[in-house]
Amino acid sequence: MAIIVNIDVMLAKRKMSVTELAEKVGITMANLSILKNEKAKAIRFSTLEAICKALDCQPGDILEYKSD
C-alpha cells in the first residue's frame, strides 16, 4: 500500500511555487521536499491544515491511497 502525495498537482493548479507554499505554511523547503517526494513517514495535522489553507483544497486533494 502507498500514500501518494499530489502537492505538485495542486501547486500547478494554483500557479504557486514550492518556495511560496513553504513560506505560507511556515516549513522549510527541505521538509516540504521530503513531503512532496513521498519520503515522509508522517505529517502533523497542523501542517496538513496549513497546506490545505494555502492551496485552498481538501486533504484528499493532496493525499491519495493506492493499494499495491
Question: What kind of region is each of these model predictions?
Answer:
Residues 1-16:
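A short, Lys/Arg-rich alpha-helix, primarily the initiator
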Residues 8, 19, 49:
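Residues within the helices of the helix-turn-helix
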Residues 11, 22, 52:
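The alpha-helix within a helix-turn-helix
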Residues 16-34:
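Short alpha-helical DNA-recognition segment
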Residues 31-34, 47, 61:
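Residue-level recognition of specific faces of alpha-helices
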Residues 39-50:
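Short, basic-rich loop-to-helix N-cap that marks the start of a DNA-contacting helix
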Residues 56-68:
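Short C-terminal boundary/hinge segments that cap the last helix of small helical domains
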